[in-house]
Amino acid sequence: MSVTAAADIQLTASGRLRHFLTIEGLSRELLTRIMDTAESFAGVTAQNVKKVPLLRGKTVVNLFFENSTRTRTTFELAAKRLSADVLNINIATSATSKGESLLDTIRNLEAMHVDMFVVRHAQSGAAHFIARHVAPHISVLNAGDGRHAHPTQAMLDVFTIRRAKGGFAGLKVAIVGDILHSRVARSEIWALNTLGVDEVRVVAPKTLLPAHVEALGVVPYHDLNEGLRDVDVVIMLRLQLERMGSAFIPSEHEYFQRFGLTEKRLEKARPDVIVMHPGPINRGIEIDSAIADGPRSVILQQVTHGIAVRMAVMSMAMHAGPDLEVPV
């Protein structure tokens, strides 16, 4: 789907959010509005009573055709903290395991008068496909589709960066690891460039970079020490071994020797660098435990921020607009 078509299906005629499928094609103003709304919800999640009534009476269906811990759980928590009713469909025991098509599954759930689908699927474009076929009152959020996009992960990451750094101007960001198979990397590149960082670097072996990667608006590096030099933010990615064969890297041990983040290598970055990882972490393969658990790591803050960001996106999509007053 083209950028224009993707943007058109995501937004109402007045330019407000209806679906959240990809960051590609969305404006800086809209991404900023999502973060500003998430900032309001961040205070709610720290209260004793962590609920607001914005989505009371609404029903959210989590449709995860791929395994997930953080994403599914934070979407569920986000919906419940907005007072929505949540259905988690067990794909292994659902009618899809008996051969029911994706569209038939959606139509049957639609007949139960649900209001939102949160979809994770191994097939790129699955969330777009669903969004094109649902009733006008239903919103679709993409929780990851194939290699294509993971927009809420990218939004919680840029929200974490904004909170740590105060903004995006002048920042140099290095994304390190399996860029080729990563939907997170693509969404983060779109978000970071839209928000105006100074430079986005991608650091990986040649076998784990897409062809013509420069067209995405990034600077490629094949040497980690050089790629980390003077950066403000490091985003580590896991090797997606389930999506690759043996030809991509010689071995996990050799990969760590060349591209694993260690304290020594991190010295090349700026003194106030922050280290991020969307999870799950493979310690000793892409990152050393001393870094993952160290003072520069904001990995657990990313998880916390994921709830507020997903609350923001759900509220904006359900209300067909970002102008919300968050009760506190």
UniProtKB/Swiss-Prot annotation:
One of its GO terms (molecular function) is aspartate carbamoyltransferase activity. GO terms for biological process: 'de novo' pyrimidine nucleobase biosynthetic process; 'de novo' UMP biosynthetic process; amino acid metabolic process. InterPro entries: Asp/Orn_carbamoyltranf_P-bd (IPR006132), Asp/Orn_carbamoylTrfase (IPR006130), Asp/Orn_carbamoylTrfase_sf (IPR036901), Asp_carbamoyltransf (IPR002082), Asp_carbamoyltransf_Asp/Orn-bd (IPR006131). Its EC number is 2.1.3.2. The keyword Transferase applies. Signal peptide: none annotated. This is Aspartate carbamoyltransferase catalytic subunit. It comes from Methylococcus capsulatus (strain ATCC 33009 / NCIMB 11132 / Bath).
